Amino acid sequence: MGRTDRTPSADGGAGVSRRRTLRAAGALGAGLSVAVSGCLGGAFGGSRTLTVDYHPYYSQAFSALVIRHGELWEEHVPVDEVEWHAVLQGAPTVNRLISGDTDLGYMGDNPAIISAANTDTPLRVVGLSGYSMGQQGNLCVVADGADVDAPADLDGRTVNVTQGTLSHRFLLAVIDAEGIDVEIRDQEINAIVTNLREGSIDVAFGWEPSMSRVVNQDGAGRYLFTGAAYEEPDLGAMVMPDSLIEERPEVAKGWLKAELEAKHVLETEPERALDLGMREEDLSRDLDRETVHATLYEDLNVDGDAARQRFYTDFSTIEPARELLTETGPAFLREEAAVIDREPPADRFDSELLAEAIAELEDEVEWDPRQVGERP
């Protein structure tokens, strides 16, 4: 089954202005080299243990839970053990990838772009763990009773978000699109959930399944709008260091085969996928099965009829995902948010290994890996 480690996260937050938040977010990207200077290489090296950073509370990385609890990696990945390291947001995983403390990271689009832009350790985005037109990570939720009915009503208010995440990027995009001024308060996602449930904050941006816990499970809030209203997609991504891909290609490729199998389970056997995912103690302790099911399979219908989630893997065949990762996302993070000081080179977004995994898997399974691998 593998071991599990956890990186603790603070529960509190501090009120900061938009400008100070942007400056701090920029330091996140630019300061990575300071935090990990002198560290090179990957965690795998000559070891037979593969270290994987995953997010137990992130619906667009639910495939990782299916791989873990279904032990799907055992058939495809030539290692003796997988060490599972749980995180609550992508930024710690970016640091761990750069410092060589982990071999593979599941994360949202914002930290994935930051990973690809770093200049210390070559990292590649190798595939998607999930995709939607703003229905998973680009979510604005308001507490019950809050006098907020439209994006314009956010002007002059305090808005809560976890800094450095895909939801943070969406908030900045909304501010830019609406021409509003807000006070951004940086809070860890669990603190956001607690404060929305208690009514101590009015509005927050976040991701699933945490937002669904507030809205559906606890009945303490409502979705105000999503990324679909701004044609802002969101996605989960898998990031690997070049060292793993080049020195242990069968391990890297094998993991992508396991990912494809997990997507097949999610797409064709939803009850089995839920059975496996709910074995994650951190998830099942806080969320009921119905809530998790809703985040994966039940459309929000807040901004049109956008699908809740697509179980896609190859970003190169899904134009909005490709544009977000390689064009609009990096440009926004560099020019508007000052989070990165360069846009990632094109070779940092690599779908070739996934193509190889799909081709090989076609001869190994009875289902069509291209259905979950390539086609939108």
Feature locations, PLM:
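Conserved C-terminal helix/tail region of periplasmic/extracytoplasmic solute-binding proteins
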Residues: 322-376
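N-terminal secretory signal peptides and thylakoid transit peptides that target proteins
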Residues: 5-29, 35-36
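Short, glycine-/small- and polar/acidic-enriched structural segments
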Residues: 46-177, 184-186, 202-205, 375
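Short, solvent-exposed loop/beta-turn-alpha elements that line the ligand-binding surface or hinge
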Residues: 71-79, 130-133, 228-230, 300-319
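Short beta-strand->loop
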Residues: 123-132, 183, 220-233
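Secondary-structure end/capping motifs
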Residues: 59, 248-336
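Pocket-lining segment of extracytoplasmic ligand-binding domains
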Residues: 188-285
